[in-house]
Amino acid sequence: MKMPKKIMTYCPYCKKHTSHSVERVRKRKASELKAGQRRFRRVTSGYGGFPRPKFEGREKPTKRIALRLVCDECHKAITPPGIRAKKFEIVEA
């Protein structure tokens, strides 16, 4: 899927349609010091298997693409619902 770098859409902060810059949101590296990660490391260490059962459902065919739309007037960002696509590209329009 190809998406233009700039799109006209409604800004809830300006309360009107304005030009927005499109950015793709990427997942950052998970912190090793969070409580859940420390607990997970403690449970999986030593003898014994994985603490949770293996997921038996099917694999989804595609990943959801997370976008950030930044308003060119007020510079506030909105996050539209994720789009499913195998390929995603931001192009000059």
UniProtKB/Swiss-Prot annotation:
Part of the 50S ribosomal subunit. Belongs to the eukaryotic ribosomal protein eL42 family. One of its GO terms (biological process) is translation. A zinc finger (C4-type) spans 11-74. Binds 1 zinc ion per subunit. One of its GO terms (cellular component) is ribonucleoprotein complex. Keywords: Metal-binding, Ribonucleoprotein, Ribosomal protein, RNA-binding, rRNA-binding, Zinc, Zinc-finger. Pfam families: Ribosomal_L44. Zn(2+) binds at residues 11, 14, 71, 74. The keyword rRNA-binding applies. SUPFAM superfamilies: Zn-binding ribosomal proteins. Its cofactor is Zn(2+). GO terms for molecular function: large ribosomal subunit rRNA binding; structural constituent of ribosome; zinc ion binding. This is Large ribosomal subunit protein eL42. The keyword Amino-acid biosynthesis does not apply. Binds to the 23S rRNA.
